[in-house]
Design a protein with these regions (language model features):
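Patatin-like phospholipase
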Residues: 1-282, 286-293, 298, 313-314
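Acidic/histidine-enriched alpha-helical segments
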Residues: 148-150, 219-237, 430-433, 474-477, ...
Length: 638
């Protein structure tokens, strides 16, 4: 997790979790004042910073690195001047974080107004820094990798690795030339291992151990029995965390300090709760306002202040995401959608945002919403919206459309709500739509339908899944209720309620999802635009996508999948899954008459891959109604 910027999904704010619910890819383009802005590194180093802060929290009282149990120096490089920067004092986690910010891989770290990167560019083997500390002998471990041949340069990481090696060879050789017979040089045989060889960590450790065992003169560096070797950081850790007397924020982001403080749950007057603080750091970073969120404990006159640093994003906080989803049954029936969303963050100190979505294809949509928190804790909010959409609604007989309509609707609404921690949300809304349905398939003399809709609505949501595509733990639930009300302008009065519950379980590489889904229209009114669309993989498999539509439905579902070793099946090392689903349920229009499938079973065999553009599934679906279908689907399925 240290080599990732993403917090645990369960730690991020609920609103940001919902960004996963569409088919847009996670990678995004960033804009600053309307201009495309590229990142300063592949990673911001957020999780790396939190790990260092947590491991070294007990050193916060030490400002002079000579006072550490083992005197220490960190070396970084000023990326603006190329000068070496030697840290002999300051905040230890920040110094270490700057000293390992490999250019291109990690974004530079700002310290005292200077942008710093890994010291590899200026002093890769800082022997002179060690001698300046007054040591008698130095032990040098040279892990410089040999240059790769052209045939071995097969990825962007290989190119970055080779570039770093070329840039550092000169300063490394200059430093190694100062070694004397009293010093010890270890050069482990690392072969082709480089900075990106994370999977080879154990082999690198073993190579270092062999290098030490084979070295001459090691005994000269062994302290005599009873000698003080200087101690170590682990033995200096306190038995309990410091009591926190105050919490302060050093904030350079777009939102008010109170917004950040509202996400920190550390009680005043109690010991530092490190696990909870790490979760809070993930929540703050997950708002997307900051490039780095760190903390330190400031000790002054017997008082301990938790100081949280939040650095605003230098590259901007407005994001564009693109995406594609498609379904194909290999029988000539396919659906596709291409979409984009643009989110403008931090419109005011409370953290307002403006979200716009555009989608073209089988289902078209233009949606824009202004989301305004009403308090610094970001609990209550108001969200007016404008919506225009178009979709196909088919009348199905034996899995074939006999009449197809193209439905278009446009309208606006207002939602009032409350977020429930990071796991859920409650929304109450009013909305008003106008629309029409035109014949797309079938008798062209069939009449078109114009309609008016107006709703009161209530939604209660919960989402604690660890992954939205292939979850291994957590649950999701949604209760939706809406009342079509003629007093607001609707053509008919009816109530509709839908409950969706899905629970994920994990055991080793295996995952199991247990789900129950119910939709009910509490009226005999036949309103086509209010029907539930079902059919397709996981939603009554064997039927084509959206091949079932009804005013009511019940569905129980069990999904199993197993994650397999990626290298067995693809060269991109993408997560690969094999699994199956079992489904049982019913779709109908009325209890006493009209369309009714009766209760029937369905199931599917599937294989899936978590690709860079979303989950990709191939499968075979069958059901007791006598239908079967092959399918390929790019986009969320279960």
């Amino acid at each position: 997790d240290a080599l990732s910027d993403s917090p645990q999904r369960e730690d991020i704010p609920y609103r940001r979790k919902q960004d996963d619910r569409d088919f847009l890819v996670k990678q995004r383009l960033t804009f600053n004042n309307g201009v495309l802005s590229l990142p300063l590194g592949l990673l911001q180093g957020q999780n790396m910073g939190v790990v260092l802060e947590s491991l070294l929290v007990h050193t916060n009282e030490i400002d002079n690195f000579d006072r550490l149990p083992i005197p220490f120096r960190a070396v970084a490089t000023d990326i603006a001047t190329g000068e070496a920067v030697v840290f002999d004092h300051g905040h230890l986690p920040l110094a270490i974080r700057a000293s390992l910010a490999l250019p291109g891989f990690f974004a530079p770290v700002e310290v005292d107004g200077r942008l710093l990167v890994d010291g590899v560019l200026s002093k890769n083997v800082p022997i002179d820094v060690a001698r300046a500390m007054g040591v008698d002998r130095v032990i040098v471990v040279d892990i410089g990798t040999p240059l790769k041949s052209a045939s071995e340069l097969t990825s962007v990481l290989d190119i970055m690795d080779q570039t770093t090696t070329l840039l550092t060879r000169t300063n490394t050789e200059k430093q190694l030339a100062t070694l004397t017979d009293r010093d010890l040089l270890l050069q482990p045989a690392l072969g082709n291992m480089g900075f990106s060889s994370f999977a080879d960590a154990q082999q690198a450790i073993d190579a270092g151990a062999r290098s030490l065992a084979e070295a001459n003169g090691v005994l000269a560096f062994v302290a005599p029995d009873g000698a003080d070797s200087g101690g170590n950081l682990a033995s200096s850790r306190p038995q309990r965390q410091a009591i926190i007397h105050a919490i302060e924020v050093d904030n350079s982001g777009k939102v008010a300090d109170e917004v950040v403080l509202g996400m920190i749950r550390q009680p005043i007057g109690e010991p530092l709760n490190l696990a909870r603080l790490q979760t809070d750091m993930g929540t703050i970073y997950g708002t997307d306002y900051f490039s780095r969120v760190t903390y330190e404990i400031v000790h002054d006159q017997g008082r301990n202040t938790l100081l949280v640093h939040t650095a605003g994003r230098r590259t901007g906080t407005d994001y564009l995401r693109l995406g594609l989803n498609l379904v194909d049954d290999f029988e000539g029936d396919s659906q596709y959608n291409v979409g984009a969303s643009f989110r403008v963050n931090g419109l005011n100190p409370l953290g307002a945002e403006w979200l716009t979505r555009l989608q073209v294809g089988s289902e078209q949509e233009l949606y824009t919403e202004f989301y305004q928190p009403l308090d610094y804790g970001s609990r209550y909010f108001v969200a007016p919206f404008i919506d225009a959409e178009a979709r196909n609604i088919d009348v199905i007989d034996d899995d074939d459309p006999i009449v197809g309509y193209r439905q278009k609707r446009y309208g606006a609404g207002l939602n009032l709500g409350r977020q429930i921690a990071n796991s859920g949300e409650v929304r109450f809304g009013l909305s008003r739509y106008r629309g029409n349905s035109r014949v797309r398939i079938g008798d062209p003399d069939l009449p078109s339908i114009d309609f008016n809709e107006a709703f009161y609505s209530l939604e209660i949501d919960r989402d604690t899944l660890d992954d939205v595509n292939f979850p291994h733990s957590g649950e999701e639930a949604r209760l939706s209720w809406r009342q079509s009300e003629p007093d607001l302008g609707a053509d008919a009065r009816y109530q509709q309620i839908e409950l969706r519950v899905n629970k994920a379980f994990g055991f080793g590489p295996n995952s199991l999802q247990l789900g129950g889904f119910i939709g009910r229209t509490d009226s005999d009114v036949d309103v086509a635009q209010s029907s539930f669309s079902l059919g397709g993989p996981g939603w009554f498999s064997g039927f084509r996508q959206d091949g079932l539509a009804g005013q009511n439905y019940q569905l129980g579902r069990l999904v199993y999948y197993r994650r397999l070793a990626p290298s067995y099946f693809n060269t991109l090392s993408l997560p690969f899954y094999l699994g199956a689903s079992l489904e049982y349920g019913r779709v109908y229009n009325r209890d006493d008459a009209g369309f009714d499938t009766g209760y029937f079973g369905a199931g599917s065999l599937l294989m899936g891959m978590d690709t860079l553009v979303g989950p990709l599934f191939f499968g075979l679906g069958v059901n007791e109604e006598g239908h079967e279908a092959l399918y390929m689907k790019l986009g969320q399925t279960f």
